[in-house]
């Protein structure tokens, strides 16, 4: 009897444990039950425990032990060793790897610094399943033996970019160089890629505009639709999309043309048949047996001559595995007419097209040339036409433009050159790297530091002003692309000196006083020592916080390492730095409603995320900055203390005090008034950013720790530790050594 029942029970168990059942029973996040709940998950990305190498792992030190030439030699071997499970077009994976590197780096966008090659995010969802990244899962699998061989010494982010470089070099193109230093992420980044979740849906709003911070015009694309906007083969409209998308990825017209023309010199597009009819699920939705691969092709052999990627089909040149000028010459040599690929995608072919392109798998077969709608756009658009014709007439200029644009594409999200590692780093510096001058003087020592702190405090500047200035300077840092920060003292330069959040008039007076201290220290010295303004700004903030702690009864000393230098206005691209302007800074209770799409609270989480803060770090930082009275514009919102300027835990104590009743302020949206429950007397004012630390249960849990009677000293030390962290976020000169 048991033998008869057992198969039935097994069958029932299998039926019960279907993916649908698993999905129904899986744990849910708060937002599933409470859609309006605050999402703090971005701040949990900064918990080091997710890194399997551990908290003491230093990637820069590992990379410095790497034999880069040996890695490049191994990559060259992979390039021309075709694998049966995914054969190489023309016997060379070079073009395939260029696409992999390009698409890894090409997600970068200027407005929030997210995307890019750093972190190796192409390995994770959703990027690994974007239609524009179709089949790049195979490219990374081809590289696995190399990654396996060198392990911790080279990250996926570095390996993918290096492979793209080696591919270009092996096919006859001279690159500008390569810099390592991209540390791998260990989970998907949390990024807003667009309002919808349907692949290839239009990212534009109802007015036809692409909202910030987006750069790609359609969901799941790196840049633009190669068939034309939303699949319509209109070269003029495509040019408009190209210009906007590439500009939002930090590229001007010349760099854009160089990248497209240079990249499309190599390889081919794959559209042997319809993707909808032939391809299986993307990696993120494929079965376990696929082991992270996706787009299984059920048509024909499934690869080689039957490969399907974009649905477009063909090559731009007759020699797809060598660098030539054919892309540009073919663009102008032929009259291009609209046609469709075997998969039904819009593309272009020469009028009276001849079969001149060798087949990728059968050397006895030939095909016509082809172009995308986005290629024809470079000939139709007046400005792009000027550049393409100039490049066609000046091949050496084109080569250099492509080399520079490729280097920028693959390194733009790495931040300053101080993060660059390896022997192939170009000696030339570029304005987009936010260059810093080298220090040509001796650094100050501990005695000098004590002397300077004393002199700063004797300038007559209040602790509040010194702390505000240090925060304004250092908090521009964003860990998304490692830009900003105090190093360079660009807060004294355009555009930062005029940002409303920085209270420009007050800032000017503080900087003037600090520069006087700097000049007095530096002049007529015989020991070769100097101090930079950027060091003084941080030192002034540290001295002021130590003084504020002393006033509250605590003796602290904030560690300080000199070495920052001061950039010039000529080393500062005003338009490039403009995107770093905080239109919301919850740490200073500042919010410009006209220039924000996120709420004040969501903006705080976003800024804390860019500052690489955890939930406790953000919480203690808010509490400390509030009692130190550093709000922008002198606002008293959230200054929940009767002793402003003293570093203590009063913000949390008073926020959680049940003797206060909070009501919405009639004076301004997003602000609240706190009244004494017994007397009805107004005690405090606060913003939504302040009250969320008592309203949200997770934030309140942390706030309760710091409001406790036994946490007064803990609060002071935790605050100063986080302060030190923020002041040093841009000190890559220290981190890499």
Curated annotation (Swiss-Prot):
Membrane-crossing residue ranges in chain numbering: none
Top-level taxon of origin: Bacteria
Substrates-to-products reaction catalysed: H2O2 + AH2 = A + 2 H2O; 2 H2O2 = O2 + 2 H2O
Active site positions, chain numbering: 103
GO molecular function, one term: metal ion binding
Swiss-Prot/TrEMBL keywords: Heme, Hydrogen peroxide, Iron, Metal-binding, Oxidoreductase, Periplasm, Peroxidase, Signal
Cross-link (Tryptophyl-tyrosyl-methioninium (Tyr-Met) (with W-102)): 223-249
UniProt keyword annotation of Isomerase present: no
Signal peptide extent: 1-23
Family: Belongs to the peroxidase family. Peroxidase/catalase subfamily.
Protein name in UniProt: Catalase-peroxidase
Originating species: Yersinia pestis
Gene: katG
């Amino acid at each position: 009897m048991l033998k008869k029942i057992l198969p039935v029970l097994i069958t029932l168990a299998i039926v019960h444990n279907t993916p649908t059942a698993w999905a129904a029973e899986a744990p849910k996040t708060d937002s599933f039950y409470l859609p309006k709940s605050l999402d703090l998950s971005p701040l949990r990305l900064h918990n080091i425990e997710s890194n399997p190498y551990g908290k003491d792992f230093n990637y820069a030190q590992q990379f410095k032990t790497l034999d880069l030439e040996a890695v490049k030699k191994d990559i060259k071997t992979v390039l021309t060793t075709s694998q049966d499970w995914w054969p190489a077009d023309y016997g060379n994976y070079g073009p395939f790897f260029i696409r992999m590197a390009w698409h890894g780096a090409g997600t970068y966008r200027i407005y929030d610094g997210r995307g890019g090659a750093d972190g190796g995010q192409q390995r994770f969802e959703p990027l690994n399943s974007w239609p524009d990244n179709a089949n790049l899962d195979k490219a990374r699998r081809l590289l696995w033996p190399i990654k396996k061989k060198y392990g911790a010494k080279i990250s996926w982010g570095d390996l993918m970019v290096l492979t793209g470089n080696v591919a270009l070099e092996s096919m006859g193109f001279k690159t500008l160089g390569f810099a390592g230093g991209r540390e791998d992420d260990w989970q998907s980044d949390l990024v807003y890629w667009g309002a919808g979740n349907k692949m290839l849906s239009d990212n534009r709003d109802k007015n036809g505009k692409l909202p910030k911070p987006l750069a790609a015009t359609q969901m799941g694309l790196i840049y633009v639709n190669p068939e034309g906007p939303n699949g319509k083969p209109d070269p003029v409209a495509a040019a408009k999309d190209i210009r906007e998308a590439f500009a939002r990825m930090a590229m001007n017209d010349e760099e854009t043309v160089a990248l497209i023309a240079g990249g499309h010199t190599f390889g081919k597009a794959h559209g042997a048949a319809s993707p909808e009819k032939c391809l299986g699920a993307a990696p993120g939705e494929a079965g376990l047996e696929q082991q992270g691969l996706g787009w299984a092709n059920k048509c024909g052999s499934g690869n080689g001559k039957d490969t399907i990627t974009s649905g477009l089909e063909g090559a731009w040149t007759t020699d797809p595995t060598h660098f030539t000028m054919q892309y540009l010459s073919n663009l102008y040599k032929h009259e291009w007419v609209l046609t469709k690929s075997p998969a039904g995608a819009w593309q272009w072919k020469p009028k009276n097209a001849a079969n001149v392109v060798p087949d990728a798998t059968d050397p006895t077969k030939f095909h016509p040339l082809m172009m995308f709608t986005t290629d024809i756009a470079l000939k139709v658009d007046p400005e792009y036409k000027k550049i393409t014709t100039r490049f066609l007439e000046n091949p050496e200029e084109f080569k250099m433009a492509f080399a520079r644009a490729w280097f920028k594409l693959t390194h733009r999200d790495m931040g300053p050159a101080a993060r660059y590692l390896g022997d192939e780093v170009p000696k030339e510096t570029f304005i987009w790297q936010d260059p810093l001058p080298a220090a040509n003087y001796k650094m100050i020592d501990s005695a000098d530091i004590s002397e300077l702190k004393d002199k700063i405090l004797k300038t007559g500047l209040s602790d509040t002003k010194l702390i505000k200035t240090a925060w304004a300077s250092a908090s521009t840092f964003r860990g998304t692309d490692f830009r900003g920060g105090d190093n360079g003292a660009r807060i004294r330069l355009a555009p930062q000196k005029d940002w409303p959040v920085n209270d420009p008039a007050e800032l000017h007076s503080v900087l003037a006083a600090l520069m006087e201290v700097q000049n007095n220290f530096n002049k007529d010295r015989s020991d070769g020592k100097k101090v930079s303004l950027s060091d003084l700004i941080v030192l002034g903030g540290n001295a002021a916080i130590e003084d504020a702690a002393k006033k509250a009864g605590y003796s602290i000393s904030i560690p300080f390492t000199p070495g920052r230098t001061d950039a010039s206005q000529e080393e500062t691209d005003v338009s490039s730095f403009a995107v770093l302007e905080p239109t919301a800074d919850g740490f200073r209770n500042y919010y410009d409603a006209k220039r924000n799409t996120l709420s004040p609270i969501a903006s705080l989480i976003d800024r804390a995320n860019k500052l690489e803060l955890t939930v406790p770090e953000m919480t203690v930082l808010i509490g400390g900055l509030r009692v130190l009275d550093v709000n922008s514009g002198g606002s008293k919102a959230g200054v929940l203390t009767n002793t402003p300027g003293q570093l203590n835990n009063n913000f949390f104590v008073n926020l959680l005090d049940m003797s206060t009743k909070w009501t919405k302020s009639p004076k301004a949206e997003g602000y609240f008034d706190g009244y004494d429950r017994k007397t009805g007397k107004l005690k405090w004012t606060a913003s939504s950013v302040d009250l969320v630390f008592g309203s949200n249960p997770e934030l309140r849990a942390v706030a309760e720790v710091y409001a406790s009677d036994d946490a007064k000293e803990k609060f002071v030390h935790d605050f100063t530790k986080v302060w030190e962290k923020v002041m040093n976020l841009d000190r890559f000169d220290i981190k890499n050594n």
